[in-house]
Structure formats: C-alpha cells, structure tokens
C-alpha cells in the first residue's frame, strides 16, 4: 500500500513518472484527480468537512505529514473544505513521492 511507503529524496535530476506510471499509481488512490496547471502535472483532491474547525484541524495534520516526509503540498483551506495539491517542485511534475503523500492524506481521514 502506498500509505505504508516513505518518500525518498527527490533532487532536480530525478526522473518524473511516465504517463503510464502516473495512471497506474492514480488507480491506487480514491478520489484524486490528475490535473495540469501551467503545464505541470499535479495530483489534487478536495476533502469536505462539517465546519471550518474540522477543515483547519485536517490542514494541520497534513502540515505534520509534510514535515515528516520532507515533501510539501499546496493546501487551500476554506469553510468545510480542504483542497490538497501534490507535485514535485524540483522536477516540475509528478514523482512517486506525490502518490505516497496523497495516500497518506487519505489515511488521515
């Protein structure tokens, strides 16, 4: 399971995933979308909560996860919603780390 793996160091010289690899890993996730923003492949998911306080608490859990994995997402916190977007800045695309962290986000809910 992806959520049981750890992220590995990803430098600018790392190789991003192929489209086929992205699709295979995406099939292991629930509710995540593969998007392209400014020509960069990213993973994105919106989580829904009953109120702002629950959404805020979840955002803090993601922040802790990001610190543990040394990999940082974009987090949009709104009333009752948290949108999480993962991609590897150093390679301007997707790495296995992004899928690992996406799975770990799901494990928090």
Swiss-Prot record:
Q: Which reaction does it catalyse?
A: (4aS,6R)-4a-hydroxy-L-erythro-5,6,7,8-tetrahydrobiopterin = (6R)-L-erythro-6,7-dihydrobiopterin + H2O
Q: Which InterPro entries match?
A: PCD_sf (IPR036428), Pterin-4-alpha-carb_dehyd (IPR050376), Pterin_deHydtase (IPR001533)
Q: Which Pfam families match?
A: Pterin_4a (PF01329)
EC category = lyase
Q: Write out the GO MF terms.
A: 4-alpha-hydroxytetrahydrobiopterin dehydratase activity
Give the Enzyme Commission number.
4.2.1.96
Which Gene3D superfamilies does the UniProt entry name for this protein? Answer: Transcriptional coactivator/pterin dehydratase
List keywords of the entry alphabetically.
Answer: Lyase
Q: List, in alphabetical order, the GO biological process terms annotated in this UniProt record.
A: tetrahydrobiopterin biosynthetic process
Q: Which domain of life is it from?
A: Bacteria
Q: Which HAMAP family match?
A: Pterin_4_alpha (MF_00434)
Family named by the database record: Belongs to the pterin-4-alpha-carbinolamine dehydratase family.
Q: What is this protein called?
A: Putative pterin-4-alpha-carbinolamine dehydratase
